[in-house]
Amino acid sequence: MAIPHASNETSYLLPPNKEDWEGQGIPDFVYEQEELMMEGVQWPRGALSLLNTPPLSHFDSALCSAWRQRMELGLFRYPLGELPTQTLPGTVGFVAQLNVERGVQRRCPQNIKSVRQEFDPEQFNFNQIRPGEVLFRLHRKQDCSGTVQQEDILVVINVSPLEWGHVLLVPEPARGLPQRLLPGALRAGVEAVLLSSHPGFRVGFNSLGGLASVNHLHLHGYYLAHRLPVEGAPSEPLDPRGRLHVLQALPAPGFLFYTSRPGPDLEALISRVCRATDYLTDCEIAHNLFVTRGAPPGKATSSSALSGVRVILWPRKPSFGIKEGEAFNVALCELAGHLPVKTAQDFSSLTEAAALALIRECLLPPAQAEDVRAALVALIAREEE
């Protein structure tokens, strides 16, 4: 991934001497609501490469320059080069990537037994990360529009990256928040997508039981220079006011929330999504969530029509720990159509049918899925007019 050097990138770089890292403090990335780009970000025609995208935003330049420096300094568990990538033949459009190192060297998952498990300070958490792993602190200026004051969020490298720019969005670690989605964390994730001028910067969340490996509140963010099926997949409304839709198309059925406007509409979306995830968590239903630029709800459309932001929520069977022997584990990116594969043999032999079979194993039984659907429809219907 070719990243231009930003003129002010030194603000987010570590000092030359390692001894100075801890004393440097965490730089703030300050932004305003006007910098959130709802329109004008599209996939380029032709090759799906960053070389053909519009100039990267201030956010992209800050993140990528700081992330690249940490890679050069050896703060990751392995160096990440260009990953072998293929689009699987078939109707879905799965993007498979070979990432052997992540499959071997990622941190072992914690002993999780419940979607509602409390934070345990004795387990690994983000208060224990090394100096230098934090890139910057996201800080939104408060404006006069009456929007909710956004809490500060740390942007931290994922030391076992699945793709370029793979970071974690972490609310103040000292609060000891368990892995349960909160509005402030989701807002930061959606706004990070809107701060990026790259159409392939995505954000996601894995619940406990949805393959979250650390029980300390965090979201994932990363770049993938490929379109994904969920960007333009068709949907059907579940609510007459268009507040909740269902994606029936492959890779997996899920619930779609969409907005094309910042401000109150975005706040309403965040509230709806978190009410839905609260319901799932309270009912011990594991779930995954994916945030991407995408098309409005409705009929299938060209995935180049990125006119707003899509938040897709998938309730799923709980899965605690990593399954060995599978080509990939099903979490936020796999449900969206991005398949990080663990071995060269699986990468060369993987088919669309095999990928769909692995994903289907993680979906709720039909009767339970229908119950969840009815509950979420009722939840949205109770929203204040």
Curated annotation (Swiss-Prot):
An example molecular function term from Gene Ontology annotations: nucleotide binding
Keywords on record: Cytoplasm, Guanine-nucleotide releasing factor, Hydrolase, Nucleotide-binding, Nucleotidyltransferase, Transferase
Compartmental location: Cytoplasm
Biological processes, Gene Ontology terms: glucose metabolic process
UniProt keyword Transferase present: yes
Active-site residues (renumbered): 218
Enzyme type, top EC level: transferase
Superkingdom field: Eukaryota
Keyword flag Hydrolase: yes
EC number: 2.7.7.78
InterPro entries: GDPGP (IPR026506)
Swiss-Prot/TrEMBL catalytic activity: GDP-alpha-D-glucose + phosphate = alpha-D-glucose 1-phosphate + GDP + H(+)
Recorded GO CC terms: cytoplasm
Record's miscellaneous remark: The orthologs in A.thaliana are GDP-L-galactose phosphorylases catalyzing the first reaction of the Smirnoff-Wheeler pathway, the major route to ascorbate biosynthesis in plants.
Family annotation (PANTHER family): GDP-D-GLUCOSE PHOSPHORYLASE 1
Family of this protein: Belongs to the GDPGP1 family.
Function summary: Specific and highly efficient GDP-D-glucose phosphorylase regulating the levels of GDP-D-glucose in cells.
Protein name per UniProt: GDP-D-glucose phosphorylase 1
Gene name, Swiss-Prot/TrEMBL: GDPGP1
